[in-house]
Amino acid sequence: MGIRNTLDKLEPHFHQGGKYEKFYALYEAVDTIFYSPPSVTKSTAHVRDGIDLKRIMITVWLCTFPAMFFGMYNAGLQANMAIGDGFGALGGWREAVTMALAGSHDPGSIWANFVLGATYFLPIYLVTFAVGGFWEVLFAVKRGHEVNEGFFVTSVLYALILPATIPLWQVALGITFGVVIGKEIFGGTGKNFLNPALTGRAFLYFAYPAQISGDSVWVAADGYTGATALSTAAQNGMSAVQQAYSWWDAFLGFIPGSVGETSTLAILIGAAVLLITRIASWRIMLGVFVGMALTAMLFTAIGSESNPMFGMPWYWHLVLGGFAFGMVFMATDPVSASMTDPGKLLFGFLIGVMTVLIRVVNPAFPEGIMLAILFANLFAPMIDHFFVQANIKRRMKRDAAYSPATNEETA
């Protein structure tokens, strides 16, 4: 009651004519964090549902937690194993915090691994939230509309697809590009045709490739270099991957990679909740999976003596790189994806096909899910257009078939 009374007392100052009317978006954002919006439908409701945008976004945000927490643990585990092999710790305040809270770099300690991983991920997330939130609030204030809860999701998704060692100034630059160029210049939430989180990562990928790809960015240990499992497969074939990791290692997430993308199991836990609550589209996920599996099997059947990626089975494509994360959390973005039911299947299928094509055919990009989703975002409006037009023509033919009989009965 104390929070509600305080907010009610402050509310008049933020309405039109009040002292702080320009900052109503900030007041509204704080109010809706603690309480549901007071607006209700007073006339006939065309959409009947007990869930609003805030609950949807918070649910998606919570569904990333399994991947987030395991990602922090795995980032620390990979670093501590490297330190145990003789590589040095990176030092700085992270080392001081780790020693104060965990006392060692023991890779056998769950707590030590989690603390070290958290010292890398949490700053990334906080910088993402602060900088991206600043741009969200700035555009909301200038346009006079509410701050949307969608940034809760954008911020965590963006942070989870970055390597743990990325410089924080690049984190800020990437989320700025993703929010401003990927969303706000098109009108804000609901009007963007590109996924903002992937747009920001794509900017970093092409502008600063040394800090977001390669062999030295995945494990937070001084002097350590090591390719991801997907890069190893692209360079040396599946035999080299299987010597280093089992399929279960990759499925559970005990491999180097971006913070939130390594554990397919943790990602699928979040996917189950999204599907049960019907927040994410099963059609898109199914389309992505089927497109990937069929294309991978086609390349496996064709084979190649010069390109080892031809021989990667579909079940390895599933657990390596960011495929699972992209399929569950990125491809299902309701704003930038197709909206018609058959369009969702085709949209997802296109992503799955292009992911494997980029991974196998283009040696410059061992990871293909990011570019595949962004390309599919560009095609989504056209996909929906063709399906809508086909539906209109089908209905017109059906109406034309019934109209003569109707006219005769009337006469």
From Swiss-Prot:
One of its GO terms (biological process) is transmembrane transport. It is an enzyme of class 7 (translocase). It comes from the Bacteria. It is a multi-pass membrane protein. The modification FMN phosphoryl threonine is found at T228. Its EC number is 7.2.1.1. GO terms for cellular component: plasma membrane. Its main location: membrane. Keywords: Cell inner membrane, Cell membrane, Flavoprotein, FMN, Ion transport, Membrane, NAD, Phosphoprotein, Sodium, Sodium transport, Translocase, Transmembrane, Transmembrane helix, Transport, Ubiquinone. It is found in: Cell inner membrane. NQR complex catalyzes the reduction of ubiquinone-1 to ubiquinol by two successive reactions, coupled with the transport of Na(+) ions from the cytoplasm to the periplasm. NqrA to NqrE are probably involved in the second step, the conversion of ubisemiquinone to ubiquinol. Belongs to the NqrB/RnfD family. PANTHER family: ELECTRON TRANSPORT COMPLEX PROTEIN RNFD (PTHR30578), NA(+)-TRANSLOCATING NADH-QUINONE REDUCTASE SUBUNIT B (PTHR30578:SF1). Composed of six subunits; NqrA, NqrB, NqrC, NqrD, NqrE and NqrF. This is Na(+)-translocating NADH-quinone reductase subunit B. The gene is nqrB.
